[in-house]
């Protein structure tokens, strides 16, 4: 009897057709969109004519496959679904939600940042969101073709893995348009209407990543920093459309010099009565005293001007860094534990356009709700992993101990490293980061899996002819893969600066750091003597082994999924999930600045130093 019941149960589950909700994004659709189930076409409809997002219901048996048909053209692959609703799928993309990308380990957990909002699905890197801007056609063409500094009112629709959000009355513009050496593929910014937020943010920026053939470096940098327990910007890859015209794939990220980022990452969206001073660090923003504090450009809503940086810089200059008690004191007014983590990453990636080497692309936030504590802000992580690096290739082997002599302008990190305890902490962070994340055993599978997932969108991106004026490198789709392992030369008028492969750099830096640490006193780095206010981590991670394919192309036979390189259309991609199926699955409160705030900051610092 039990056997009979089991057979009946199996029969029912394999023959019963359930009503399923289908959702697909089809930007190129001109007429009709259908879901095809065993030759039966069911039409899907778009509720908003501005957004090519088609939905509908159809009967689907358990284990039955389906695909989408747009204007008579069917996807050349089948999809499988477990559940009563698809995720927000994209036409001709075989993998909607990645399940085979390894998770990077979280390290340096003691003292890691916990104040920020990072859990929203818009930052889920296993999905590629789609963003649709709807604006006046004449204004949008003017913006694209003439790269105006004007901003325009638009409607912006954000489609995530499960949800769709539309905001009317957004302000859209280009990020720093019209500069002499801008790339034709522009970067964009927009603000949500006053009082409206998404993921506790009301300001978004997307960067083009044209300097990097792989388009992976900048997001990878931020991903690693957050795994190191920092408050680094969130980032995710997105598809971007203006009036249904595809502009390409971009890196959407927090703009750290905007209060949107501060509100989300420092206060979980619970905005305090008074926000602190916020600054964009331009060239020369070194924190040195005496120095040019005009390099710190206050946010237009900042209640403090650039002179509020001076008391900290002056006090920092007076510190005797051989005295632990003085270092402990300054830790109350400068989160240098977080700063050390940022500097470890700058060193490992050879970030030549950041704080340590050039004193630029940084920033600062003064939290007036926490004793005017200063937080270092890092931004724009594109000049990393060997991209556009003018140093000789031997530079990858240079020890961090040589940096103070090579780059004397980085006074914050150079002086902190004069303290033996801080130096030990820095070396411990460096060692753990290389052992646990910054090595080819970890990053090799992670980076190649991310490339596999993004490959159809990278090929689409490389096929777009940009209508804006500017530099065109002409990186090919094949080079998005090749530059993971070796240098490549752009076929355009400018040959580009991709002389290093991304993983080639990682392998070389991993080898150099391990060699340095093994020949120094870092043999006992796990028993570091900590300086108060700069905690390290407990335990000694196991030593990683070199990823065997660090300097060669990833062997398709050894990968957990495969794809054909150099095919003519995204539909030719073969993506095999481990399970064997294709899964589808600006308004911030502020009050006017008052002079006593600056005086108070000066008094507080003077009383401690």
From Swiss-Prot:
Keywords: Cell membrane, Glycoprotein, GPI-anchor, Lipoprotein, Membrane, Signal. It is a lipid-anchor; GPI-anchor. It is found in: Cell membrane. It comes from the Eukaryota. Residues 527-547 are annotated as: Disordered. Its main location: membrane. May play a role in cell adhesion. This is Spore coat protein homolog 1. It comes from Rhizopus delemar (strain RA 99-880 / ATCC MYA-4621 / FGSC 9543 / NRRL 43880) (Mucormycosis agent). The gene is CotH1.
């Amino acid at each position: 009897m039990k056997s009979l019941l089991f057979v009946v149960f199996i029969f029912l589950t394999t023959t019963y057709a359930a009503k399923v909700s289908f959702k697909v994004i089809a930007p190129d659709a001109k007429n009709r969109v259908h879901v095809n189930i065993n030759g039966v076409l069911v039409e899907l409809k778009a509720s908003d004519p501005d957004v090519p997002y088609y939905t509908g219901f159809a009967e689907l048996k358990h284990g039955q496959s389906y695909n989408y048909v747009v204007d008579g053209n069917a996807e050349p692959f089948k999809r499988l679904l477990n559940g009563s609703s698809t995720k927000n799928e994209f036409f001709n993309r075989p993998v909607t939600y990645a399940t085979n990308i390894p998770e990077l380990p979280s390290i340096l957990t003691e003292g890691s940042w916990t104040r920020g909002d990072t859990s929203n699905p818009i930052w889920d890197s296993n999905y590629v969101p789609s963003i649709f801007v709807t604006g006046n056609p004449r204004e949008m063409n003017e913006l694209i073709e003439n790269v105006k500094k004007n901003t325009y009112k638009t409607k912006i629709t954000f489609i995530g893995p499960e949800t769709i959000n539309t905001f009317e009355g957004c302000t859209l513009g280009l990020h720093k348009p019209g500069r002499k050496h801008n790339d034709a593929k522009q970067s964009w910014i927009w603000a949500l209407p006053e009082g409206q937020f998404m993921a506790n943010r009301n300001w978004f920026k997307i960067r083009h990543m044209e300097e990097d053939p792989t388009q992976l470096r900048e997001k990878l940098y931020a991903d690693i920093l957050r795994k190191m327990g920092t408050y680094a910007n969130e980032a995710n890859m997105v598809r971007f459309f203006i009036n249904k015209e595809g502009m390409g794939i971009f890196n959407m990220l927090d703009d750290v010099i905007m209060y949107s980022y501060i509100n989300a990452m420092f206060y979980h969206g619970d905005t305090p009565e008074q926000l602190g001073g916020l600054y964009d660090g331009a060239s020369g923003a070194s924190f040195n005293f005496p120095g040019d504090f005009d390099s710190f450009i206050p946010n237009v809503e900042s209640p403090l001007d650039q002179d509020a940086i001076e008391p900290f810089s002056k006090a920092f200059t007076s510190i005797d860094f051989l005295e632990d008690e003085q270092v402990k004191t300054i830790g109350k007014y400068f989160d240098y534990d977080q700063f050390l983590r940022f500097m470890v990453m700058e060193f490992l990636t050879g970030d030549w356009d950041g704080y340590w080497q050039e004193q630029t692309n940084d920033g600062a936030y003064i939290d007036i709700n926490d004793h005017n504590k200063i937080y270092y802000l890092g931004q724009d992580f594109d000049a990393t992993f060997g991209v556009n690096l003018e140093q000789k290739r031997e530079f990858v082997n240079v020890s961090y101990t040589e940096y103070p002599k090579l780059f004397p302008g980085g006074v914050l990190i150079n002086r902190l490293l004069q303290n033996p305890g801080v130096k030990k902490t820095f070396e411990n962070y460096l060692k753990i980061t290389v052992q646990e994340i910054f090595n080819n055993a970890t990053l090799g599978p992670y980076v190649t899996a991310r490339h596999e997932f993004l490959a159809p969108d990278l090929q689409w991106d490389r096929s777009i002819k940009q209508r804006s004026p500017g530099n065109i490198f002409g990186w090919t789709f094949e080079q998005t893969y090749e530059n993971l392992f070796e240098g490549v030369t752009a076929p355009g008028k400018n040959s580009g600066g991709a002389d290093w492969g991304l993983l080639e750099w990682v392998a070389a830096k991993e080898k150099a750091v391990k060699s340095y640490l093994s020949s120094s006193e870092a043999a006992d780095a796990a028993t570091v003597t900590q300086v108060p206010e700069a905690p390290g981590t407990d335990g000694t991670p196991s030593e990683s082994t070199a990823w065997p394919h660090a300097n060669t192309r990833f062997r398709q036979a050894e990968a957990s999924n495969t794809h054909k390189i150099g095919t003519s259309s995204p539909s030719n991609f073969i993506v095999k999930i481990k399970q064997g199926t294709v899964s589808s699955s600006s308004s911030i409160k502020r009050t006017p600045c008052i002079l006593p705030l600056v005086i108070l900051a000066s008094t507080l610092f003077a009383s401690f130093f």
